[in-house]
Amino acid sequence: LIDIPATYDAIGYISDGNGFPLTSFARPVPQPKDNELLVRVLSSSLNPLEFKLADLNFFGNKPPVALGFDVAGVVIAKGRNVTDFAIGDSVVGMADCDGHGGWATGGQGGYAVVRSYLAAKKPEAISFQDAGVLPICFLAAYLGLKPHVKGGETIYIPGGAGGVGHLAVQMAARTLGAGLVVSSASTDHNRQTASDCGAHAVIDYKSPDASDQLVDLTKGEGFDIAFDATYSEKSFEQTAHLVRPGGRWVVLGVGPGRTTRTSVTESRVDQILASKGATNINANVLSFFGEGKLIDGDAQVFLSTGMEASMRWHSEGVVRPLIAKAVNGSVDDINSGLQSLREASGGYGKIAVALSSSESSY
């Protein structure tokens, strides 16, 4: 039998709003429901979701709330309806983000419950560190691209070195059959990163003629699809202009005019898209969670297929995460890493979080 402690030292926010910087607090180890896994979390990663939840508590959970929704670790308990996973399986998954995550101090790992359709078995050849940086960003790219990209199409993905962007570029270029994948970045390093991920062309988006360069790459026609995961209203308007007549504009998150949950700004995106008969598609992973959200069978299958694809495509070498930095599971390191994400200072790839001093399983 696996010895499961009653509590652990979680990392998260303890106030309802303005909860950043994060702190540590004792939390009971959660119990899995019928269709859930309890995972001892060995590795995770940082996402903007964590500091936004700490700032805004937009799911309305009563603090203290543990954060850390990317999880890779070992199944130590499971609900009675779970048949696809066994105790001791190495897994990767996404913790329920309207609940609690799995960050913890002390180097002994954290604990998180994961819905079984948001988990996949981790192949032995993939490290817990690599697996632990994938779930949220991979599912965001998968949700934004997989249902919409058709073979041979042209696609523009700004920020192709970012956490979502570098995975989206690989996905579009290497697995979905896009004919032309174009990206952009502000530094030589990040432009090279996007190119290494498979982008056929990468431009400097700060260039005065960036839009002209992008349109020229499509021979003046515009892109079949623009996938914008930047959370920038300025970028939203630019990418909307770049979509061809009748094309698709896919946005990650809450969409134009709502780049944060506390403010609504005027946006011209809908007007721009309507003028050319283009479609506005919202790809928001968080739409599957929160108040009153029920995930139907089709959505569960889609998410499960996405999690399995994250491991399969990694094993095949076609979509692999770029880890820019790895930090230990200390409050100071996590706060520092989240602050760098908040400032969006030319970052690239993912920041991994090691929650255990050893990657050994049971």
Located regions from the model:
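NAD(P)H dinucleotide-binding glycine-rich loop of Rossmann-like/cofactor-binding domains
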Residues: M94-G159
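C-terminal hydrophobic helical "lid"/dimerization subdomain
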Residues: I2-I4, I295-Y362
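Glycine- and other small-residue-rich loops at beta-strand/loop junctions that grip anionic moieties
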Residues: Y111, L134, I157-P158, V182-S184, ...
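Local beta-strand N-terminus motif with an aromatic residue
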Residues: G88, G109, G152, A199, ...
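Glycine-rich beta-strand-centered segment in the early N-terminal region that forms part
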Residues: P28-S45, D55-D98, L118
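Mid-domain Rossmann-like dinucleotide-binding core that forms the NAD(H)/NADP(H) cofactor-binding site
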Residues: L134-P208, D212-Q213
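Short glycine-centered segments of the SAM/dcSAM-binding site in methyltransferase folds
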Residues: S90, T154, L180, G247-R248
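Glycine-rich cofactor phosphate-binding loops and adjacent beta1-alpha1 units
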Residues: V149, V202-I281
